[in-house]
Amino acid sequence: MAENQINSPEITEPSPKVQKLDHPENGNVPFFRVKKLSENAVLPSRASSLAAGYDLSSAAETKVPARGKALVPTDLSIAVPQGTYARIAPRSGLAWKYSIDVGAGVIDADYRGPVGVVLFNHSEVDFEVKVGDRIAQLIVQKIVTPEVEQVDDLDSTVRGSGGFGSTGV
């Protein structure tokens, strides 16, 4: 907490009343704010007007070892609108062509630190990431955060407690 106070002149917590993005105030969609932390940082961008995700780019050369993982810096900090979170997802081309996947990709609306991307290499060959390579996509999604209620029993369903594979393979 003390570290946040050093970096920020004023710390503000989000209001408990969350703005609904399907009914934005004054007809405006809230901003997705981005801070570049270095000259190598590339602002997130959408490849087409209907793209769900904003491409994230590497800010440093990184090797993802065969059958291994690496944390690739973007040198960006972000602020997504209240009532949303950002999810880091794989790029389909990297997954299909090079067996590169993304892990651990949830960014909460109150996180202001640097964004890094965990890349997993499922191939037998090292994967080289260059500065500026598009490595993942960031998808801003609405969230629902209901209150937690402890109960003695849950309602019955047809599926019941059937777990992995219980509805077919």
From Swiss-Prot:
EC number of this enzyme: 3.6.1.23
Residues that coordinate or bind substrate: 91-93, 105-108, 116, 159, 164-165
Region (Disordered) location: 1-25
Keyword annotations of the record: Hydrolase, Magnesium, Metal-binding, Nucleotide metabolism
One Pfam family named in its UniProt record: dUTPase
GO MF term list: dUTP diphosphatase activity; magnesium ion binding
UniProt biased composition (Polar residues): 1-10
Role of this protein: This enzyme is involved in nucleotide metabolism: it produces dUMP, the immediate precursor of thymidine nucleotides and it decreases the intracellular concentration of dUTP so that uracil cannot be incorporated into DNA. It may have as well a metabolic role in merismatic cells.
Protein name: Deoxyuridine 5'-triphosphate nucleotidohydrolase
Organism from which the protein derives: Solanum lycopersicum
